[in-house]
Amino acid sequence: MAKSPTPNILICSFFFLIAVLSLPVDQTLATDTRPDSWAFLGGYGQSYPGWGQTTQRVETIDLIPRYNHIVFDEMGSGWYKGFHSTFFEFPVSLILNPEISTMIGINFLAAYTFTVNEKWQPYIFGGGGPVYIFADIPGMGTKLNGNYQFGIGLEYFLNKQNHLLFEYRYHHISNAGTAEPNEPLNSSKFIIGITF
C-alpha cells in the first residue's frame, strides 16, 4: 500500500512557514531594540507507543544551549502585543531507554512572545532541524534524522538579564521516508531553563 504524501506536505509547509517568518523585513515595520540573549535549558522527554506510528518508548534527559535573536520588536497591541524572535538551539540528549546513548542536533525555531505582563510572558514556538541518534532504536531506519517540534512556554523575569523559562514541547523525530523502517518518535518534553 502506497504511503500518503500528506505528512511530507505538512512537514515541507511547516518548514516553509518557519523560513518565511525568519526573513528580515523593512526596519520601518519594527525596530530591534531588545537585546539578544543566551539561555541554558534542561528537562525530560518521553515518546509514547501508539501516538501516531510510534512503537518504541524512548526516554531522554535533554540539555539545550539556546541563542535567542529578536527579529521584530514591539508588534501588535492589546493582549497580543509582543515580539517575534528566532531560537537557535544545540540540544544534547542522554537516552535512558531503550539503551544508554546520546543524540545531538541543531534546532531553528520561530517564536512569538506576548509582552502584556511585565513579569510573566507566555510564548509559542515551532521549528526543527537535523538530529543524529547514536542509539540503535528499533524502527529507526537511519542514524541521521530530522525533527520538528512546537510548544508553549512561560518566561518569568527575575531581573533584567536573568529570566526563568518553563516549556512544554511536542517533539517528532523521523527520517522523512529516506530509509525503511521509518517509525517516528512522537514525544512530550518538559523543559526548564534560565537566560543570561
Show which residues each predicted segment covers.
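Surface-exposed strand-loop-strand hairpins of Gram-negative outer-membrane beta-barrel proteins
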Residues: Q46-D62
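Outer-membrane beta-barrel "beta-signal"
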Residues: L63-P65, E183-F196
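Short loop/turn motifs that connect adjacent beta-strands in outer-membrane beta-barrel proteins
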Residues: V25-D36, V71-H84, P98-I100, V116-Q121, ...
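Residue-level signature of outer-membrane beta-barrel architecture
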Residues: H69, Y112-F114, L154-Y156, I194-F196
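Sequence/structural signature of outer-membrane beta-barrel proteins
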Residues: G45-W51, E74, P91-N97, P130-I137, ...
